[in-house]
Amino acid sequence: MSIIPCTTWVKKGVASTNPAKIQLTPKELNQIIKHKQPELTPPVENDSDKKHNKVKKQKSEVGSSEIDEYNFDKYDDESGNIHCNIGNIASFEEDGTDPLITGEDDDSEKDDDIIKSNDNLVLIGRVEGGGSILEVFVYNQDEDSFYCHHDILLPSFPLCIEWLDFDPSDSKPGNLCAIGDMTSIIQVWDLDLMDSLEPAYKLGRKPNKKRSQSYIGHRDAVLDLAWNKHYTHVLASASADHTVQLWDLEIGAPANKFTSFEEEIQTIKWHPNEGHYLLTGCADTLVRLFDCRYETVVKSWDALGEVEKVLWNSFDTNYCLVSTSNGYVQYIDIRKDKSIWNVHAHTKEVIGLSLSSSCPGLLVTSANDGVIKVWDIINNKEPWFIWEKKTNLGALLCLAPNPDNPFVFAVGGDNKSHNYKIFDLLEIPEVRERFRERKLQSNINDTRTQEEKEEMMDVTEDKNSTIFNLNTTNTPSKRTKRNK
């Protein structure tokens, strides 16, 4: 088995130019290996795991013999397949040297360690056999380069990745990512550290009878994560346990829990401008909009199937998109009770739903049918189909837009030998012709009138309700050291 269940990008200029390397003595390394070995042993799957296992999305079998009409294979030739498991780490010699390293790093390898200001990082959750890895790739379009910078061993099958800059132990913005997996624990990793074997910190705790410890956080797999860019100490998590948790990263504990769901919550997204609104999509076929200040559902809409993804139209925040398990994409005006349009976009679950970072109307969808499609939704009344391709990546499990280039998207699938690509859509004549003259703009554009904003905020204010009632809508003024 070799699959890519999740991926995301890191903006240019965020990562440290020279990431620090963790230096461990042989004794320290052996102690960590012994401690981590049980965590990294694949658990026996029970009936509950099978029910919630998102790998069910990979049932499609897509042939890989298709001719690549646009020669997209060149974008991921360097990605390869990594077979890595902490149980197979080589033993170090007594002098601390690695027996697998026979010489000093050459200049080219040292240059590859340096992250340039025009480099993007690409975060890839990969599962190889019984092992799980977070791969940190460097992508530079100007230099036509895409290579693995470093990787991190993960304790469980990764289901979602979310980048964030909040480090509770540092007053400066960091470069971290939160990972949700088949366990109930969220791990937050420092991306500016190489060779790290432990996360920066964890969110959640499993019960321990010997220590008289009860659950903290979720009780089942974490299916999606959403970091709040306005209240940067807030992270939302959606779970197979039928709850959404809001975490206060300052103290590393849940501050609120929403339980209005009949099934697992598969997708969540914060409003681009109003940081207290959270959009959720559930397997019970309902899309819900929460006002997190009051822990209430402001509005809800019926979907045409189990909700796979929700997405705000950041170019016009009156609207959001929904994709479903039976292949539909729906477009919703949040001021209305029903969707504006529905299109049967794919034959299977639409797992990928992404808008361009700065080209209005450019929508990309991908699904378990192995097909990626491009649409134009600049006209809110109906979508225009522009282009499609049946890839050789297998069932498509994740899709992510480049935050700096409006036409670059990353896609991951479950084809054992070929499961990751970066697409430059300007290479496609139909897409280039449709969008090349369109004026680019920031994808955060609040077009609502003051009256419309007030209409969505008609709940009586309670200043003591949640973590959103702070003196500032950004980072708390003082951060305290905490146990990691």
Please give the residue ranges for each predicted region.
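Eukaryotic helix-linker segments that join adjacent hydrophobic helices
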Residues: 169-223, 235
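Loop/turn segments within WD40 beta-propeller blades
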Residues: 117-118, 162-174, 225-232, 238, ...
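Short coil/turn segments within WD40 beta-propeller repeats
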Residues: 129-134, 183-187, 220-223, 241-245, ...
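A structural motif specific to WD40 beta-propellers
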Residues: 147-149, 197-200, 255-256, 296-299, ...
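Short loop/turn segments that connect beta-strands within beta-propeller blades
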Residues: 140, 192-194, 249-252, 292-295, ...
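Terminal intrinsically disordered, low-complexity extensions flanking WD-repeat/beta-propeller proteins
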Residues: 1-121, 130, 349, 378-484
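Beta-strand-rich domains and repeat architectures in extracellular enzymes and scaffolds
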Residues: 95-135, 150-178
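WD40/WD-repeat beta-propeller blade N-cap
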Residues: 153-158, 203-222, 258-265, 272-273, ...
